Structures are given as C-alpha cells and as structure tokens.
Amino acid sequence: MRVLLKFLLDCDPDAAWRALQSPTAFREVALPWLDFQPDGDTSFPTVWGGGEHRVRVRALGAFTVGTQAIRLDTLRPAGEAEHATRILRDSGGGTGGVLSALPHLDHRMAIAPDPAGPDADGRLRTLYRDQLIVRAGALTPLAWYTLWAFWQWRGHRLRRLAPTWAYDPPAASVTEELDEPGRTEETA
C-alpha cells in the first residue's frame, strides 16, 4: 500500500534538498510523536551519507518501539522534463521491536522547483512529493493507517519548518570585512 504527499514548500529547492539530507531535520519533522537516536555508540552525522544508518525509534519520548535501518541513495529521473528533480530514497526497514513488522519500506522524497515559477516577490518555492510503499504482510492495512496518519503530521511539520531552511550565504571574506569603516587587519 502507498502513502503519498504532494505540496509546495516555502523555501528554494536547494534548501529543501539540504534539509532532506539532514538528520536534524529528519528528527524535527517527526517530533513529538517519534524521535530517532543513533543505534550504538555513534552520533548522527551532520549530513546523511549514502549507505546504511541504524536508528532507535522512540514514541512520544517515552519508550523505544524498535530499531530501523535507513538505507539512503540519491536518484535523478532520466526524462528531460524532470531534469531538475532530485530524489532521496530510503530502502531500509524495521530491524527490531514492533518495527520488525515493517522489514521493507520504499520511501522516496522528490524535490523540484515549483512548476509555476517564482512568486510575485521573485522567490522560488519547492514542489515536494513523498511516496512510501508499505509491505507488512497481513499487518499491511493496520500499518498503512498508522503510517498515513503519521505522514500527515510529517507533511504539516515539513510545511511549517521549510521557511527556516533558507540558504545562508558563505561568510564574508576577510577582504570584504576590511572594507568596513574602522576595521583594519589588526582588528579583524
């Protein structure tokens, strides 16, 4: 069974793409219903890399419901019309506890520029599409309803957090800083 989301995010596609690759944003969109912690003695990287990441999943901040493998890779559609689309795919699944009932998940998150173009203020927004395919045998209908409800929460949180993902330009160079009145190399 599938869970689908499709909406616009109030941030540019590059900011949305960075957020999808951030363990911090991953946790923020799930809170307070679920929280994720690294499984083992490691800490989350600043940015997800490809490969597998194991996590412990806590519900309502109170109890661990299981462990999950997050297996990430990035995809690009082959068609010219979708050239600007970037896709992050998680092909992991539950590995322990209640989550072991969901051993195979296929989760794809697609980021593309808003097809309508920039808004009246010249800001480009992001078309976000999310697809989760759930296979849990006889438990699939129950898993689908639970995940559908949680996905609605994720969608709400994504839309709410997106404006905070704005791109921060690189720090000014020392030369630019020295151009400020009253600044010298000694005070820089």
What are these regions (language model features)?
Residues 1-49, 188:
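Hydrophobic ligand-binding cavity/cleft-lining segments
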Residues 21-22, 35-36, 99, 122-125, ...:
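Hydrophobic/basic alpha-helical segments enriched in Actinobacteria
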Residues 2-4, 65-71, 102-108:
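Short, surface-exposed coil-to-beta transition loops
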Residues 77-149:
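Beta-strand/loop substructures that line and gate deep hydrophobic ligand-binding cavities in soluble
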Residues 82, 113-124, 169-187:
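Intrinsically disordered, low-complexity terminal tails and inter-domain linkers enriched
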Residues 38-96:
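Glycine-rich portal/gate segments that line the openings of hydrophobic small-molecule binding cavities
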Residues 8-12, 58-60, 112, 131-135:
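Solvent-exposed residues in well-ordered beta-strands and their adjoining turns
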Residues 132-177, 182-185:
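A conserved amphipathic terminal alpha-helix motif
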